[in-house]
Amino acid sequence: EIGVRLVGSEMCIRDRGLRVAWFKVHEPLAYYASYFSIRATAFDYEIMCQGRERLEYYINDYNRRKNELSDKEKNTLDDMHLVQEMYARGFGFCKIDIYRSKATRFQIVDGKLMPAFSSIDGLGDKAAELIEDEASKGEFLSQEDFKTRCKVSANTVETMDRLGLFGDLPHSNQISLMDFL
């Protein structure tokens, strides 16, 4: 017998802590997917999912400016530390897939985490849900079609294009004679 008696909510807290610890050790990708989907408050795809070196650059930059950080940047730094741990354990991210990614839920795909649409800076949950919904209706003809159907800003489309999330999806619906040559 331990000699300490836990009652009610104390028991729940202890049990929850044990479950979290078990998942972190035995099912790490499930732990990270759940954490980033539910608890992360300022996850930024562009900062955190472009490799360990880029992440380290931002962590160092934020640490240098620690006293000047906005609340959002402080939250981002907290999330960056967990991503840093994930990279150190040998795990990584795959690119967001405009047809397979979820609005707000991170997924485990081929031994990596696929971030949610909402992890793209400037893309809110409602827009992310609309993207997921429109993608389920069929393929996009172009980035222009994506912007129209998903009702996202030109800025968002530009960011996603810069990050390579559209793959070979053309910019416009218009066909050029050069496409046939």
Question: Model-found features: residue ranges?
Answer:
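Positively charged, low-complexity/disordered segments
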Residues: 1-8
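Noncatalytic, beta-rich nucleic-acid-contacting surfaces in large DNA/RNA-processing enzymes
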Residues: 9-10, 14-181
